[in-house]
Curated annotation (Swiss-Prot):
May be involved in a process influencing telomere capping. One of its GO terms (molecular function) is zinc ion binding. The lineage of its organism: Eukaryota, Fungi, Dikarya, Ascomycota, Saccharomycotina. This is Restriction of telomere capping protein 1. The keyword Zinc-finger applies.
Length: 1342
């Protein structure tokens, strides 16, 4: 038989080692491959060639060399000199070798000697000798399969316009095209002859196969059948024996799929069955015995997988592996090979089915993150290898859990854990992990297991063909997944592969070349790798890498088998012969299943797995259609042969990979440098912060990411007040740890208060930054929260003795706000606050706690970038909020404690004074400024005596503020005179009236605080609940309202005192007579009084002259009047300035008139900081203040706040901080933050008749002029957009009343008719109609 002119045969002498490397061969590049070639189970479509008979221009395009100089495929470095495992310049085909002799005939080319070039490679490198067959075809190839006839050394290759039968000869190592089923005249070389087929001429349109071509051959009785995609939705079956041009080789066509077919496969056991899957997500099973016609449009079994497109579908193989034992030869097979099949889908899911129960899949595994492209069953075990577009090849166990122990081995190196599968038989949605994952780096389009028996799954070989530019076929041993065992290089990228037997493997490439290798003659990759190599670990040169001299192997050591006498081996189901008589449709698996379908039977087809009732894939056949999970099977008519179980369990020992020793020299040097230079890390952090400071853009981005702009998020996250306090305490510890290391006089703290020590690097950096900046700028430590915490610890260490009989009993303040409320109610059950007021108070306290935590966090952020100005601003805001929080919690305790005073030892004057001065605010001086934690953890000092208390003369003033306020003269007003007698008389009367009214009304201490949404709406409601006790707290001494640091050493000048004394509304030394009157009130105390004293400042002078006694009386009578309900403010920072009645004296009026808000008033302070931020252009601080405090203190107008936040959002978008901008919008307290830019949209109306834009400007001007002339403004009501000035026609009228649609319009969606809202409402709702008023068919409204 002559050779086909379409095949270029390269005969190779026996014993030679030819390795083709034709770089000038005509081929197509990567781009043409994606557009013209096809690949089995691939995910892309390719265009057909043109219908003309001329050769494609793509065949003449030269493909560039795809072999790189250096290859890093799969993490293995291979220089080109070592990439000769399959390709070598010394072995080129004769027709392409420039050194070959040009004389001689074609018949003796195979016997000619080839002059080879000297190959300058390492002599230790083993050359390839495994390439046995190679030939080039001038037709495009896309799929390959072997002929399952042992008497024929045949291959079947398919392409768009080619379906050829090829035979290879082991004797002369040649491949020849025997027959082309598409162009049967290709075997004749006579020019001008035509096909012998009837009605076929030269101009007959050439047949083409599907764009997604796949080819498969049958088994056993159907080994002469070839299945191929004839078009996108049909499978054509050809007969190999009908190779003559007279016979028509087409047997039948299977065309039930509605979309393209991607894969099909013959059953190895029941060879008459063929399965197919396609884009329609359906699996079709065909019985070739029942499809004897030329075309069949209905399959025997149809399964809708209820998933997406099927990329590949395969039957479980049924190989017969013969072995010898004591009883003789035996055959190993698989019992379930005739019934199981699997499919892989676009979604990456792997589904396993049992033909006996097709209504429900057995397993569903999420195999790949992207589309799955191919799968292949293990020859004798229930494992499936899958390949996907994600570049991974995964091994999955799909058997029963009972057999899982057979396949476990010991782990080694970085191999995945070989755990037992966690899927059950009926668990369709179980989550499982692959037994093994091979990262190829390219989409895996084809993979095939070596058809050899393997008792250990990890001794199996797997051939992989990728879609990338790597022109090679890799063969992996599952025992060593990181380094392939063989790399078979081809000229162009591989398109498919097939194992002929255990040693011979064929592939086709993009260059239309068929290659065959003998892997026993191929060197392994480890043999060609250099043994003495030291190189950098990565491209950046970070570390060295060397390879151990022990190479290792690719196999797992297996112990010898221990055969048992009880092992009996039965014949494989593939050897079953159909009886000669009887209907073939009722024989075999299909017949057994169809016989087993019964409407009344309740038993399962097999007792091992009952039918499931889950909703799953739909199943249909010619005889019966089953609903999901609603059918049952009958096992009365199916006789199935069984196989012996597989080999018994054996213990396996995994091989150890080569030892890789790394030496990270830069890291070693870096560690040495860090040990020698202890402060280098601190310098690096400080240099980074300074570099950020020099870049305003980077600083803005950093602040936008790190700062907290809203307390709403923090409030929502907190489940209770305890969570908020816990977060606040953690923030306190960060600042505390940062300041512990600087200053010689800093008090040592106890780090075990919270029980948490954070050793992270980030916390260490914060400590370094904060310590450095505090020391650099000499920031006074008595203004930091850490010092307040130090004081709290020291106070806990000091001894506390019980007080006198007039003092209160010791009580612990619990660690939450709710416990404070419960303790207060237990003290005096008769005085209960309304539940609504209590809830409102708790909410406001929680808000304050959140704001304090945010202020602390923002201060630490500014400190980390060396921005001391903004750092002090946030510290100032935090301390001001602490004062408000302290007053709210302390007022509750003090009001209850005041009721426990002994009436016999305390007069009305003393009770008021003790509550206002000595009993509450000295406690606040001691611990009130130590943050939220001190409010709920520390015991109030006002309720205890201190034996170690120093004398009054030894105590020093806390701040300069108290010294300046002490300079006022009070003696003239303390001396008794006529005016003072009159004042005392009036004050005494008012006090008695106040006390009587208070007793009658049962007043309690008001819980109102400074945080109010609407101050004026709630002021009248809160006034009846005010008491002199609260007013006294408002006018306590300035020392009580400041934030002093109590330590037994001389304090430096406080930053808060310095800043506040220069406030425009603050105090100075120039006071007049009126201010002196003001100083008489309990607002001030003497500097010689200890803040920890249990006795008020006035009581400490009880034994002095009568002048002081008179002053005490004056103070006691003045306080109730100032704190009367009539003048009680609803906020502690806003005191009424209304004029007193004419009955009071002039000096009493002055005493009330000049009372001003304290300089640390929170609202005043935040407004000043806001104005300063706007004047200096501090955008971040401005927006931060508006976010946190606008809704609480009304910093500015609401429109200005919205505009500022909207511009801040635009700034975030400009610097691509979209996530932060989204959070700003999410937690913004204003809904319409974007204003006209975010809520309004321009809608253009076009005329439905002429298509012009409806503006109606001309009619608008006419109506406006007419309205001006007549003075009738109702004329403008005629204007609208319900008509068009261009075409002078009206738009659609109402479907019911047929009047113009001028106002609100409703549209009926099913038909599109429009109508007035009133008309549609009357038609559908009032009249209960369901059809359209226009008479459109169907229900329009339900």
């Amino acid at each position: 038989m002559s050779l086909s002119p379409h095949v270029e045969n390269a005969s190779i002498p026996k014993g030679s080692t030819p390795i083709p490397k034709n770089r000038n061969v005509s081929s197509i590049g990567k781009g043409e491959f994606l557009g013209s070639s096809s690949s089995n189970n691939s995910s892309f479509r390719m265009n057909h060639y043109s219908n003309s008979g001329q050769p494609s221009v793509l065949d003449s395009i030269r493909r560039p060399n795809l072999t790189p100089t250096f290859s890093y495929s799969n993490g293995v470095y291979m220089p080109e000199s070592h990439r000769t495992s399959s390709f070598n310049d010394s072995y080129l085909p004769y027709d392409k070798n420039p050194y070959a002799k040009t004389t001689g005939s074609m018949s003796n080319k195979s016997n000619m000697k080839i002059k080879t070039k000297k190959n300058a490679i390492n002599t230790n490198t083993r050359k390839s000798s495994g390439l046995i067959y190679t030939t080039k075809v001038d037709k495009e190839l896309s799929s390959i399969d072997k002929v399952n006839d042992p008497n024929i050394n045949g291959l079947v290759c398919a392409g768009k316009t080619h379906l050829g039968l090829y035979k290879f000869s082991p004797s002369d190592r040649s491949i020849k095209c025997v027959h082309d089923f598409i162009t049967p005249n290709s075997n004749t070389s006579t020019r001008g002859t035509t096909s012998l087929l009837p009605k076929l001429s030269k101009r007959t349109r050439q047949n083409k196969f599907s764009t997604i071509a796949d080819v498969k051959t049958g088994f056993n009785n159907y080994k002469n059948c070839i299945a191929v995609c004839n078009n996108s939705t049909a499978i054509s079956i050809y007969d190999l024996n009908k190779s003559s041009s007279i016979d028509n080789p087409l047997i039948t066509s299977l065309c039930e799929h509605t979309r393209s077919i991607n894969s099909f496969d013959f059953n190895m056991v029941e060879s008459n069955l063929i399965i197919s899957g396609g884009q329609d997500s359906c699996v079709k099973i065909w019985d070739l015995r029942s499809n004897k016609s030329k075309s069949s449009n209905r399959s025997d079994i149809s399964i809708n997988t209820a998933s997406d497109s099927i990329r590949d579908v395969k039957w479980m193989p049924g190989y017969n592996f013969a072995s010898k034992n004591d009883q003789g030869s035996s055959t190993y097979g698989n019992l379930k090979s005739g019934y199981k099949f699997a499919s892989i889908h676009d979604s990456g899911y792997l589904l396993k089915f049992d033909l006996r129960q097709p209504a429900q899949y057995e397993k569903k595994l999420n195999a790949h993150t992207g589309p799955g492209l191919c799968l292949n069953w293990h020859p004798n075990q229930e494992y499936i290898a899958t390949g996907g577009r994600d570049g991974k090849c995964c091994l999955w166990f799909v058997g029963d859990n009972a057999n899982a122990a057979e396949n476990t081995v010991l782990n080694y190196g970085n191999s995945p854990s070989l755990h037992a599968p966690n899927t059950s038989l009926n668990n369709s949605g179980s989550l499982a992990f692959p037994k093994l994952t091979i990262n190829t780096g390219y989409p895996v389009t084809k993979l095939k297991f070596k058809p050899a028996y393997s008792s250990n799954i990890y001794n199996s070989l797997l051939g992989i063909s990728s879609m990338g530019d790597e022109a090679e076929v890799r063969i992996y041993s599952l025992a060593r997944k990181y380094i392939p065992k063989h790399v078979l290089l081809s000229e162009t990228p591989s398109l498919g592969l097939v194992w002929w037997d255990e040693n011979l493997i064929f592939n086709i490439d993009k260059g239309t070349r068929i290659n065959g290798w003998d892997i026993n003659k191929e060197p392994t990759v480890l043999e060609n790798l250099s043994k003495n190599t030291t190189t950098w670990r990565d491209l950046d040169g970070n570390g060295l890498l060397s390879v151990d001299q022990e190479i290792g192997s690719y196999e797992v050591v297996e112990p010898e088998l221990q055969p048992t006498s009880s092992t009996t081996c039965k014949k494989h189901p593939g050897t079953i012969k159909n009886p000669k008589n009887g209907n073939p449709e009722n024989q075999g698996i299909i017949g057994g299943i169809k016989k087993g379908f019964s409407h009344t039977g309740l038993t399962s087809f097999t007792p091992e797995r009952p039918p499931t009732l889950k909703a799953g894939p739909t199943f249909s056949s010619k005889s019966l259609t089953l609903a999901s999970g609603a059918s049952s099977f009958n096992s009365s008519s199916a006789s199935l042969t069984s196989l012996t179980p597989q080999t018994e369990n054996r213990e396996e020992i995994a091989i150890e990979p080569p030892c890789i020793i790394t030496l990270d020299i830069p890291q070693i040097f870096n560690n040495i440098r860090l040990t020698k230079i202890a402060h280098s890390r601190k310098k690096n952090v400080i240099s980074e912060s300074s570099s950020m400071k020099n870049s305003p853009v980077e600083k803005f981005k950093y602040l936008a990411r790190q700062l907290k702009f809203s307390y709403i998020r923090e409030h929502n996250v907190s489940d209770s007040a305890d969570t908020a306090y816990k977060n606040d305490i953690e923030n306190i510890d960060v600042v505390k740890n940062a300041t512990e290391t600087h200053g010689d006089n800093t008090t040592t703290t106890n780090n075990n208060d919270d029980g948490d020590d954070d050793d992270d690097d980030d916390d260490d950096d914060d400590k370094i930054i904060e310590s450095h900046l505090l020391k650099k700028y000499n920031f006074p430590e008595n203004n930091t929260w850490a010092t307040l915490m130090n004081e709290k610890v020291n106070n806990k260490k000091s001894k506390r003795n019980s007080s006198s009989s007039r003092e209160f009993d010791e009580k612990d303040v619990r660690s939450s706000i709710s416990s404070i409320s419960a303790s207060r109610q237990s003290h005096d059950r008769s005085r209960k606050i309304d539940k609504n007021v209590e809830a409102e108070l708790q909410e406001k306290i929680q808000t304050l706690v959140d704001l304090i935590s945010i202020a602390t966090h923002n201060a630490s952020v500014y400190l980390s970038i060396d921005d001391l100005t903004n750092f002090k601003i946030w510290i100032l805001i935090r301390d001001s909020l602490l004062w408000d929080l302290k007053w709210m919690t302390s007022s509750q305790i003090s009001s209850d404690n005041a009721s426990n005073m002994d009436a016999n030892e305390s007069s009305d004057f003393e009770a008021g004074e003790n509550l206002k001065t000595g009993k509450e605010f000295p406690e606040e001086d001691g611990a009130g400024t130590s943050g939220a934690e001190s409010l709920v953890e520390e015991r109030p000092q006002a309720f205890r005596a201190n034996s170690d208390e120093p004398s009054d003369a030894e105590k020093k003033p806390v701040s300069k503020l108290k010294e300046q306020l002490k300079n006022t003269e009070i003696i003239p007003y303390a001396q008794p005179n006529e005016d003072s007698d009159e004042v005392l008389t009036k004050l005494k009367e008012l006090q008695n009236q106040r006390l009587e009214s208070r007793t009658k009304m049962g007043e309690t201490v008001s819980d109102d605080v400074i945080i109010e949404e609407d101050e004026h709406e709630h002021q009248e409601e809160e006034q009846p609940h005010d008491s002199p006790t609260k007013s006294a707290q408002f006018h306590a001494s300035p020392i009580a309202k400041s934030i002093p640091i109590l330590q037994k050493r001389e304090h430096r000048k406080s930053f808060i005192d310095t800043f506040m004394l220069h406030s425009p509304n603050g105090y100075n030394g120039d006071t007049d007579i009126g201010n002196e009157d003001d100083n008489i009130s309990p607002r001030f105390t003497y500097n010689s009084v200890s803040p920890r004293s249990k006795v008020s400042s006035l009581q400490s002078y009880a034994t002095t002259t009568s002048q002081l006694e008179t002053f005490k009386k004056l103070s006691s009578h003045t306080a109730p009047i100032i704190g009367s309900p009539r003048h009680a403010p609803s906020r502690p920072d806003s005191i009424g300035r209304e004029q007193l009645s004419s009955s009071l004296t002039k000096k009493l009026a002055k005493c009330k008139k000049i009372i001003a808000d304290p300089p640390w008033d929170t609202k005043k302070l935040i407004k000043q900081l806001y104005n300063q931020a706007t004047e200096t252009g501090n955008v971040v601080l401005t927006v931060n203040i508006l976010f946190l405090f606008q809704t609480i203190y009304q910093i500015t107008e609401i429109d200005i706040a919205k505009d500022a936040i909207a511009h801040f959002l635009l700034l975030l978008h400009r610097y691509e901080l979209f996530g932060i901008a989204a959070d700003v919008l999410k937690y913004c307290p204003f809904e319409d933050i974007m204003g006209s830019e975010g809520d309004q949209s321009s809608i253009r109306l076009f005329c439905e008749r002429c298509g012009e834009l409806i503006t109606n400007e001309s009619s608008k001007e006419k109506l406006r002029a007419e309205a001006q002339q007549t003075g009738n403004k109702k004329i403008m009501d005629k204007f609208g957009y319900w008509y068009c000035d261009s075409c002078k026609k009206k738009n659609t009228s109402c479907v019911l009343c047929e009047r113009p649609l001028k106002k609100l319009t409703m549209v009926i969606l099913p038909c599109g008719h429009e109508g007035h809202f009133q008309c549609i409402q009357e038609w559908f709702l009032d009249e209960n109609e369901q059809e359209c008023p226009g008479g459109c068919p169907g229900v329009a409204f339900i």
